[in-house]
Every structure is written in C-alpha cells, then in structure tokens.
Regions:
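Active-site loop/turn elements of alpha/beta-hydrolase fold enzymes
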Residues: 69-72, 77, 134, 208-210, ...
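Flexible "cap/lid" loop of the alpha/beta hydrolase fold
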Residues: 129-162
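Catalytic active-site module of serine/aspartate enzymes centered on a nucleophile-bearing elbow/loop
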Residues: 234-276
Length: 276
C-alpha cells in the first residue's frame, strides 16, 4: 500500500479501509520513521480521537497509526467480545499495512487494556509500551452487587442518551457495548499479565494529576495498578501529568510526546536485546 508523500498531503491524511480477514478496519497513517501505534480509549474510535496537535507532533519523527476498532466508527465487522480479539485484529492490521516492527504502542484508557493484551500475545512486535492513564485491570474494590449494578445501568443510560444524541448517537451506542463487557475485559487482562507478563521493553505509565472525587479505595486500586504496570519491566517508569485530568492527550499532550521520544531515543540494539 502506498501513501501520498507530496508536500502538505500528510497534514490531513485520508483514512483507508484495510482487509484483516472477515472484515475491514478503517486506518490512518501519517509521518515517516519508526512505527508508533495509538490505541484510543472509549468505544475505540481512534481516528481523530487523539487530537490534531499530538498526532502532528508525533508524525514529525515517526510513522503514526490510528484506527477504529472492529464495529466502531467506519470499521466493519462487529465489536469484539474479548480484548484478545481486539489485539489480534490490530496485529493483522499492522502486518497488512507492512508497517515497520517492532513498534511503540501507546494505549489511552481502555486502549491500555488492548495494548497490554497485544504485548502478551505478540511480544516480538513490541519495542516499547506507553500507557496514558490506563484503565485498571483486575477486579475493582467494593461491593460486587454495587459494581454489577453500575455496569448494568451505565450502558442502558448511554443507549437512552443515544436516542437523543444526534451526531453523537453512534459513539454512545458503541461505548455502551464497551462498558457492557468492561468487567470481563479487566479480568481478562489481569489474567494475561499474571500468566505471561509484559515483555521487558521500556514502559512509561502516564497517570493523571487531576482526578475527580472518588472513593479512597478506588483511587488506591487505580494507583496500585499503574505502579504495577511500570514495575512489569526493569525499564519501566511512572510519569505524572500534573496539569491534566483523564483527557491527557488534549490537556497535556507534550508529556505523551516526551514519553515517545524517550522510548524512540533508545539505540535499536538495546530494544532488540530487551525483546529477547
């Protein structure tokens, strides 16, 4: 597949549909250099979901891939039932596009779960991992009954909002599907980390410095998981986006650029050694 490299053509690249088997994924590639994969949070509408400033900055030094997950945005198929299916979809997409591997994977929020599963299933594809305020894996603290009711009611409220959502109707319905399977996704990733662990590549975990009010036990659970992610590698580090809430790509995008630069600056032979 060829990309238009004429001056100015890479400013707003045209998304393409890429066959990954029984469906096609909508993907956007911009820039030149080593591959950086941005895996978005929410329902998984990744094209345009990271903010133009961040994508443009990263594309000055890397080949940047964004994409919509199956059944989301402009991608075909149905929304995946498991995180492993999402990770394998991304694996097929990267190889279909013939992008340079190993790549640096950047997962924001729910995308952090996808990139973790990707790393456990396809470690040779991974040169580095950057988690942007990732969703915590495992089982959150508190009452199981309250937790189950919350994950039951939230998708229903989103679907109700979608009835009057106008242009936001589709993303709201897609997010409802994601939340319906959220508890299973968090358990799935926790189990994969326990069984396989992440590859010993450089890891940066960027945590939000401005959090909404939440129970102390939930905050402790979130912080503990972020530190545990960084500790998965001898080359892991925590970073705090002091000025940002969960919306780090929009409120403090420079800290993501810094993390990518740190990982990309490692000599190629060091990354190869880490992947062995």
């Amino acid at each position: 597949m060829e990309w238009d490299e004429r001056p100015g053509s890479n400013d707003v690249p045209t998304p393409v549909m890429v066959d990954v088997g029984d469906h096609a994924l909508c993907a956007q590639v911009r820039g030149k250099g080593p591959t950086v994969v941005l895996d978005c949070g929410g329902s998984g509408q990744g094209i345009g979901g990271w903010g133009e400033d961040l994508e443009r900055t990263l594309a000055e030094r890397a080949t940047v891939l964004t994409y919509d997950r199956a059944g989301v945005g402009r991608s075909g198929g149905s929304q995946a039932r498991t995180v492993a299916e999402m990770a394998d979809d991304l694996h097929r997409l990267l190889h279909a596009l013939h992008l340079e591997l190993p790549a640096v994977f950047v997962g924001w929020s729910y995308g952090g779960l996808v990139t973790q599963l990707y790393a456990t299933r396809h470690p040779s594809d991974v040169a580095g991992l950057i988690f942007v305020d990732p969703t915590a894996s495992g089982t959150p603290p508190g009452s199981a009954l309250v937790r189950d009711l919350s994950f039951l009611l939230a998708p229903r409220l989103l679907r109700l909002r979608a009835i009057f959502g106008g242009t936001n109707a589709q993303p709201l319905r897609e997010l409802a599907v994601t939340l319906t399977g959220m508890q299973n996704a968090m358990r799935e990733v926790a189990q994969a980390r326990q069984e396989s662990g992440l590859p010993p590549v450089p890891i940066r975990v960027i945590t939000a410095g401005r959090r909404p009010r939440m129970p102390k036990t939930h905050l402790e659970h979130l912080n503990a998981d972020h530190h545990a992610l960084a500790d998965q590698s001898p080359h892991g580090q925590m970073m705090v986006a002091e000025r940002a809430s969960h919306q780090i790509p929009f409120e403090q995008p420079e800290i993501i650029s810094q993390a990518v630069d740190e990982v990309l600056s490692l000599p190629p032979n060091s990354q190869e050694d880490l992947n062995r």
